[in-house]
Amino acid sequence: MSYRHTQRGTLVLVTMGICALVMIVILIFTSIVIGTTALVVCLLLMIMFGSLTVAVDNRAIEIEFGIGWIHREIPLENVDSAEVIKTRWFYGWGIRLTPKGWMWNTSGFDAVQLNYQNGKHFIIGSDDATALAETINQAKMG
C-alpha cells in the first residue's frame, strides 16, 4: 500500500509572488542590495513552502515542504490512529505549534490529526484529508 499527494500552497505562492513583484519594483527604483536580498528571501520562501507532499507506505509517513529541504518521517509504529479534523483559522500555515501539538500545513483548514501512542498529536494539513487518514489507518492494520 502506498499513498503520495502534493498540495499546492496557493496562499503562500500568491503572497510570496506579490512580495517578489514588489521587491522587483523596489530593486528597480532603490538599492540593489535591499531589493535583491528581499527578492531572494521571497523566492526561497516560495520554493521552501509552496507545496506540502505527504507519502505513506507500510512503515512510515513522510512529509516534506517544497523541494524537500524541510521534511519529517514519522514511523507508523508510533501512530495509534489518524482522524480528519478542521484546523482553526488562527493556527495559520507553515510549521506551527498549536494547542493540539505541532502542525505542518501549507493551505486550507482540512487536516489529519495523528494520535500518537504516548498521547501527543501531530497535525498534517491536506486537501485530501479523508483519503490520507484512511490510508494511514489501513497501513496501521497491516
PLM feature spans:
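Transmembrane-cytosolic junction motif
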Residues: 44-60, 64-65
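N-terminal membrane-targeting/pre-transmembrane regions
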Residues: 1-29, 103, 109-111, 121, ...
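Non-transmembrane, membrane-adjacent beta-strand/coil modules in membrane-associated proteins
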Residues: 50, 64-128
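Cytosol-/stroma-facing membrane-proximal "stalk/adaptor" domains immediately downstream
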Residues: 128-142
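Short, aromatic-rich membrane-interface segments at the entry and exit
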Residues: 30-39
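Hydrophobic alpha-helical membrane segments, chiefly transmembrane helices and signal peptide h-regions
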Residues: 18-19, 38-41
